[in-house]
Amino acid sequence: MDTIAAISTPMGEGAIAIVRMSGPEALAIADKVYKGPRGKRLSSVDSHTINYGHIVDPETEKVVEEVMVSVLKAPKTFTREDIVEINCHGGLVTVNQVLQLVLREGARLAEPGEFTKRAFLNGRIDLSQAEAVMDLIRAKTDRAMNVAMNQMEGRLSSLIKRLRAEILETLAHVEVNIDYPEYDDVEEMTHKMLIEKATKVKKEIEALLTTSEQGKILREGISTVIIGRPNVGKSSLLNSLVHETKAIVTDIPGTTRDVIEEYVNVRGVPLRLVDTAGIRETEDIVERIGVERSRQVLKEADLILLVLNYSESLSDEDIKLFEATKGMDIIVIVNKTDLEQKLDLDRVRELAGNQPVVTTSLLKEEGIDELEEAIQSLFFTGAIESGDLTYVSNTRHISLLHEAKRAITDALEGIENDVPIDMVQIDLTRCWEVLGEIIGDAVHESLIDQLFSQFCLGK
């Protein structure tokens, strides 16, 4: 492989920016541009050390930057190749000059995710662990981070590898029974034993799939839409959950004329929170566009926060909102309880049915804890708090687990219906192969390229 380089820190002004190199020539290229105290060369220093010096243009001998350089020698590195990380002062100009120097001296600009891709190709991590790296970067809550970290450390991989080993052992027994039935010392694989082994695998796959709904929520967030008539407190609710002013809060109906989106961490549950324009009939063209967008995001939401005004009677528009959200997960929020009551709460609870109704005074910051509790209990039963964080959150993994379940189910049905054993072998083999795709065994190169292209440069 050639030697790659990229800036591995976010672009912009900051304390430190890092240019990362990985590959067989990383140390040689670094030696060309690095000038250390008393002529020290990076290729001769100990591995896993950080070294003070300067980056110098070898053509002009001009000092470009004062740096600290980390040297990590193969194979005990993330990519299992030699890695050099040049720690520069933050800023766009100097870090780009350093990058251009190492590229000129023989490195190639890395593609997005190429460092992690090399870790996968060199056997440092499997595909599910590589995908977990991106999940860790994108985690919006502590829970999401813990799930990604467990997957990155190989928890899911170990489980998948164990299942595959059990299937392979079963296949080997079946093969021996078919090819060498005359040997007395070969354990006979009876139908009962086959059913027991296949059922065990199926149950473990199903157990993983039961975590997928919560896992996807932790990974992708709950698409949550705040709806209600204008000036009932939707923007105040958004700001209370986000803890900063994102939307304009005024007494003028129709102030929010567009869709405002923000990620919110509610007790470890990531909400992709959308504040919509008030849904009402209006002659204002700009507001009407916002109302239409509100109706569209409403259709795509996982959770609806329907806000009502405690100080106003239930209107036809409120009732229409209840009708529009029938069959959806909603939490009804009765706001402005600091004002005189005019809302019929019994009627509201009747319209809400089994859905939670929470009373709040966002002005006085009352009722927020109850709302957060309602959100958490609606999506999580408490199992998420346990130490077992082997959650399946990746859509690709979930799809493959469903396919593996179908294959093992077909194998079980075949055994129970006395189909020829070689047909059962086909289904067992298919299950084994599909599970292997989760960790990267027998995955098409185009899929690998597509997965790693989603990473940022320098990772």
Curated annotation (Swiss-Prot):
(6S)-5-formyl-5,6,7,8-tetrahydrofolate binds at residues 20, 85, 124, 459. Its EC number is 3.6.-.-. One of its GO terms (molecular function) is metal ion binding. GTP binds at residues 231-236, 250-256, 275-278. Keywords: Cytoplasm, GTP-binding, Hydrolase, Magnesium, Metal-binding, Nucleotide-binding, Potassium, tRNA processing. Mg(2+) binds at residues 235, 256. K(+) binds at residues 231, 250, 252, 255. GO terms for biological process: tRNA methylation; tRNA wobble uridine modification. It is an enzyme of class 3 (hydrolase). Binds 1 potassium ion per subunit. CDD domains: trmE, TrmE_N. Residues 221-380 form the TrmE-type G domain. PROSITE patterns: G_TRME (PS51709). It comes from the Bacteria. Exhibits a very high intrinsic GTPase hydrolysis rate. Involved in the addition of a carboxymethylaminomethyl (cmnm) group at the wobble position (U34) of certain tRNAs, forming tRNA-cmnm(5)s(2)U34. Belongs to the TRAFAC class TrmE-Era-EngA-EngB-Septin-like GTPase superfamily. TrmE GTPase family. Homodimer. Heterotetramer of two MnmE and two MnmG subunits. This is tRNA modification GTPase MnmE. It comes from Bacillus licheniformis (strain ATCC 14580 / DSM 13 / JCM 2505 / CCUG 7422 / NBRC 12200 / NCIMB 9375 / NCTC 10341 / NRRL NRS-1264 / Gibson 46).
